[in-house]
Amino acid sequence: FWYPKFGPGQLWETLAADVQAQGAKLQFGHSVKRIVCEGGRVKAVVCDTPQGEQTLEGDIFISSMPVKDLVRGMDAAAPARIRELAAGLPYRDFVTVGLLVPRLGLKNETAMKTLGNIVPDCWIYVQDPRVKLGRIQIFNNWSPYMVKDPEHTVWIGLEYFCAEGDSFWNMPEEECTAFAVSELEKMGVVQKGDVLASHRERVKKAYPAYFDTYEHMDEIVSFLNGFENLYCVGRNGQHRYN
């Protein structure tokens, strides 16, 4: 995979700068609470903002928010069946634990040359039944510019698939990090004493899932397509992983 020099987030930073250069105004710290619909169109969104509740009107609305939240925000504008189907759409959340280490206990046995001769993978999927860990990210291979000293250290991300509010999601950060390190030790990837820094992130609705009410997704799409000025985009906006 090819990533921007400073990681995937740089794509959106560049996009934000470009649209602002064209006169767009970006509102941060706003949370959409209600979508006002009228005559087959979206008329406005009601938001919680640092200045209190505000109503923002527009001609065109592009939504990347989760479909279940979008439909819930429409309230009575959506038929009861559509609200029920959207509320039942499932998601998989995940926790990622980032670790900075001087080396990995994995050998680069390929012909690919890498900085520090680390393994060349962007991701490694974990199939070891002894651990909960699902995937290892190697950020050096996304872009070496994401790491301060890519020749002597490695930033890895450990992905755990879970559900918002479950025991793993709610685990204190220190305990979660210790658990992640112990799993890597079990697999011979790192040693506990090698960890130079760590960081834990929780990601809600990371993956839209294809079960429960998803089999009726076409009904939800048909309903949303009825709004001529509403465009649903992205993974959560379309409840579609790829």
Segments from the language model and where they lie:
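Short glycine/threonine-rich loop-to-helix capping motif typified by GTGT followed
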Residues: 205-214
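Active-site-adjacent bridging/hinge elements
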Residues: 224-232
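Short beta-strand to alpha-helix junction loop
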Residues: 1-18, 27, 168-175
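Short Gly/Pro-enriched loop/turn and capping motifs at secondary-structure junctions
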Residues: 163-165, 205-206, 238-239
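Mid-domain catalytic core of redox enzymes
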Residues: 30-189, 193, 201, 214-216, ...
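A conserved beta-strand/loop element that lines the FAD pocket in flavoprotein oxidoreductases
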Residues: 19-33
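General small-molecule cofactor/ligand-binding pocket signal
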Residues: 25-27, 196-199, 231
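A conserved FAD-binding loop/helix module that cradles the flavin
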Residues: 234-242
